[in-house]
From Swiss-Prot:
Probably binds to the DNA sequence 5'-TGAC-3'. Keywords: DNA-binding, Homeobox, Nucleus. Gene3D superfamilies: Homeodomain-like (1.10.10.60). It comes from Zea mays. PROSITE patterns: ELK, HOMEOBOX_1, HOMEOBOX_2. The lineage of its organism: Eukaryota, Viridiplantae, Streptophyta, Embryophyta, Tracheophyta. Pfam families: ELK, Homeobox_KN. This is Homeobox protein liguleless 3. It comes from the Eukaryota. Belongs to the TALE/KNOX homeobox family.
Amino acid sequence: ELKEMLLKKYSGCLSRLRSEFLKKRKKGKLPKDARTVLLEWWNTHYRWPYPTEEDKVRLAAMTGLDPKQINNWFINQRKRHWKPS
């Protein structure tokens, strides 16, 4: 009975929280075109794959990604694939 009463009272709030949580957990691959552009930059700069802020802005404009996505892609790429020589 208490559970039903609480659900009735807070169901709107709970559904908003649930949808907000699901939005934030959305996860997926970057678009293929964007990955291609980033990989081209990566292959050209493999010895030191640390793009400047200007590079990141340019890559974001070319790919349509957020600067944070560009930054995260390079962090993950270096962690997974880069062997400093």
